[in-house]
């Protein structure tokens, strides 16, 4: 633990000061003698990477040693909470380790055989098995459950939904009855109506959103993690399929080309959006500043920061810079809102995770 005293601008408010002692934030002097490490500048509640896989790697096999190293790469840019939407590696032994972020896990993805990345997640033989798979996740105690909502169907040569609407509705109800929330990977348009009607709590990616589905998202308060820097990878994802599945290729390219317009429309309509990098596959760890910068192309800079900070923390049940709250902080020498408006976030001058300087 570190004894810290901060003075400066405290986002999302204004000028202020606080102390960190025994791992917690104190808005008045806690009465301890110190010595105090002085911090000045701009304080932001610790960042959340709302779509980050430390248990998935693009090469070799994941393990806890590597997972820990990857999490530290995220901490270095200010990430103090990782929402991990699917992992075959149980990363729970990393919980509570000094210097590491807090985790919100979902267990393994739920998909269908030949309808997701080979070897990743639980891949069912038949859609009718979804309800039982969701029940297993709920019994495991995960606060969220991740479904693969669409993927290429090679029999039609394009993105297509994995699950019948009635099965989805029953599966989501089972999760909710157990106190779990449900999110779904969706690239295209066709899977969205069934997922939204079933009452999922969030959509990952969401590049196929349009006026009707955006309206439903707003009405139902369904969150969106657009993973904008992952959508930037669509050309390289689709290229290997260009000749064999030309319809899929053109579809993915169209989703890519209109991505900013799609997410700007979602933001302007009032969809709650959160920052996530999809690190662990195509994207490297420590990329959250890039995702925040991408979000700032479709919403105001302060809202892009909020999507990775205080709004994301509230969404997942974590406190901000509040009296008595666990101290997770990012400190900047310059105003991150101004820097973001001029092209990108600066490097933090300090990161505090679990009450200690990282």
Feature map (PLM): residue ranges:
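Hydrophobic faces of well-ordered beta-strands that scaffold small-molecule active sites
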Residues: 46-52, 82-84, 103-107, 145-147, ...
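Distinct, well-ordered alpha-helical segments
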Residues: 93-97, 192-199, 293
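Divalent-metal coordination cores built from histidine and acidic residues
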Residues: 64-178, 222-231
């Amino acid at each position: 633990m570190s004894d810290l005293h901060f003075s400066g601008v405290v986002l999302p408010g204004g000028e202020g000061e606080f102390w960190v002692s025994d791992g917690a934030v104190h808005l008045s002097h806690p009465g301890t003698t110190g010595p105090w490490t002085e911090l000045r500048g701009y304080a932001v509640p610790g960042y959340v990477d709302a779509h980050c896989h430390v248990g998935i790697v693009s090469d070799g096999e994941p393990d806890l040693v590597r997972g820990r190293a990857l999490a530290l790469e995220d901490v270095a840019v200010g990430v103090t909470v990782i929402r991990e939407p699917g992992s075959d590696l149980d990363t729970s032994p990393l919980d509570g380790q000094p210097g590491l972020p807090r985790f919100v896990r979902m267990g393994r993805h739920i998909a269908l055989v030949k309808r997701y990345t080979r070897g990743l997640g639980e891949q069912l033989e038949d859609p009718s098995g979804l309800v039982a798979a969701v029940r297993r996740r709920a019994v495991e105690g995960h606060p969220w459950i991740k479904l693969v909502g669409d993927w290429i169907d090679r029999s039609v040569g394009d993105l297509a939904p994995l699950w019948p609407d009635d099965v989805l509705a029953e599966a989501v109800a089972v999760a909710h009855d157990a106190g779990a929330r449900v999110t779904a990977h969706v690239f295209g348009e066709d899977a969205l109506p069934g997922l939204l009607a079933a009452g999922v709590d969030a959509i990952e990616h969401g590049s196929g959103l349009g006026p009707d589905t955006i309206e439903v998202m707003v009405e139902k308060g369904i969150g969106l993690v657009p993973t904008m820097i992952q959508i930037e990878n669509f050309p390289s994802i689709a290229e290997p399929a260009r000749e064999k599945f030309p319809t899929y290729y053109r579809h993915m390219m169209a989703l890519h080309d209109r991505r900013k317009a799609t997410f700007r429309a979602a933001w302007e309509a009032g969809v709650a959006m959160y920052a996530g990098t999809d690190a662990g596959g195509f994207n490297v760890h420590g990329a959250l500043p890039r995702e925040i910068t991408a979000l700032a192309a479709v919403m105001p800079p302060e809202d892009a920061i909020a999507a990775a900070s205080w709004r994301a923390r509230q969404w997942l049940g974590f406190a901000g810079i509040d009296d008595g709250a666990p101290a997770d902080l990012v400190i900047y020498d310059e105003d991150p809102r101004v820097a973001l408006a001029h092209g990108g976030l600066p490097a933090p001058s300090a990161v505090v995770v679990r009450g200690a300087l990282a």
